[in-house]
């Protein structure tokens, strides 16, 4: 298994939908989560870069699909945050369409990291993301974020509860805890990404360039 240097991750581009993404080759691992789940902070912690992914004081600001390259043909994808109450309904529907289309049609997408605030896990849209991934045979890592907000006993109870709940999806779904503030869980995230990038088959360029 190759240990990648995530500190070398760099921004490639932003796209409003799947049609504006670069060619569907290599391996992509996407990060998804509700608007306040700590997704940008997790990406910045993983790469040890303070502003690789912009953290916004206004949840729901990230409306684009953001691509980052870790190494040649190996990309991380920051998907639009979902579920923020103050975003207009039409925009919510647009985001959900873009998310669904990306998850269903992007061949190079081979792993999905779903981030959830450990205090409020498995909301409807979180479950929908996991269902989409499992239905598309995409491996899932659930990261329960902001673990520093709970005492040790409550953390373990939440972790066990979510691990039990995801069994119902009947897919490749692993659950771990994560804290950007305490740098807890970063090693497990890196190990999972290394495994995915090393063991999964990259998508090759086709003759017609599709």
Curated annotation (Swiss-Prot):
| Record bears the keyword Lyase | no
Q: Check the record and name the SUPFAM superfamilies matching this protein.
A: P-loop containing nucleoside triphosphate hydrolases (SSF52540)
Q: Which GO terms describe its molecular function?
A: GTP binding; metal ion binding
Annotated residues that bind Mg(2+) are located at 40, 62
In its UniProt record, which GO terms are filed under biological process? division septum assembly
Keywords from the named record: Cell cycle, Cell division, GTP-binding, Magnesium, Metal-binding, Nucleotide-binding, Septation
Residues annotated as binding GTP: 33-40, 60-64, 78-81, 145-148, 178-180
Report the InterPro entries cross-referenced here: G_ENGB_dom (IPR030393), GTP-bd (IPR006073), GTP-bd_ribosome_bio_YsxC (IPR019987), P-loop_NTPase (IPR027417)
The cofactor(s) it depends on are: Mg(2+)
Cite the EngB-type G domain residue spans from the record: 25-199
SS bonds (residue pairs): none
Q: What does this protein do?
A: Necessary for normal cell division and for the maintenance of normal septation.
> What family classification does the UniProt entry report for this protein?
Belongs to the TRAFAC class TrmE-Era-EngA-EngB-Septin-like GTPase superfamily. EngB GTPase family.
This one is known as Probable GTP-binding protein EngB
Supply the source organism for this entry. Escherichia coli O6:K15:H31 (strain 536 / UPEC)
The primary gene name is engB
């Amino acid at each position: 298994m190759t240990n990648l240097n995530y500190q070398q991750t760099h921004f490639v581009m932003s796209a409003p939908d799947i049609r504006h993404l670069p060619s569907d080759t290599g391996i992509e691992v996407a990060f998804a989560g509700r608007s306040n789940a700590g997704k940008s902070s997790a990406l910045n912690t993983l790469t040890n870069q303070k502003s690789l992914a912009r953290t916004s004081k206004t949840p729901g600001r990230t409306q684009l699909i953001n691509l980052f390259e870790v190494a040649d043909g190996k990309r991380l994808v920051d998907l639009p945050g979902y579920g923020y109450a103050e975003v207009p309904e039409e925009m919510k529907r647009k985001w959900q369409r873009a998310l669904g289309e990306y998850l269903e049609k992007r061949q190079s997408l081979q792993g999905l990291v779903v981030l959830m605030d450990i205090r409020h896990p498995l909301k409807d849209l979180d479950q929908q993301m996991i269902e989409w991934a499992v239905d598309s045979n995409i491996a899932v890592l659930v990261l329960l974020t902001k673990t520093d907000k709970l005492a040790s006993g409550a953390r373990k109870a939440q972790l066990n509860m979510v691990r039990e709940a995801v069994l119902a999806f009947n897919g490749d779904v692993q659950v771990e805890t994560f804290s950007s503030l305490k740098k807890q869980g970063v090693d497990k995230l890196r190990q999972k990404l290394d495994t995915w990038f090393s063991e999964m088959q990259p998508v090759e360029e086709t003759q017609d360039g599709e």
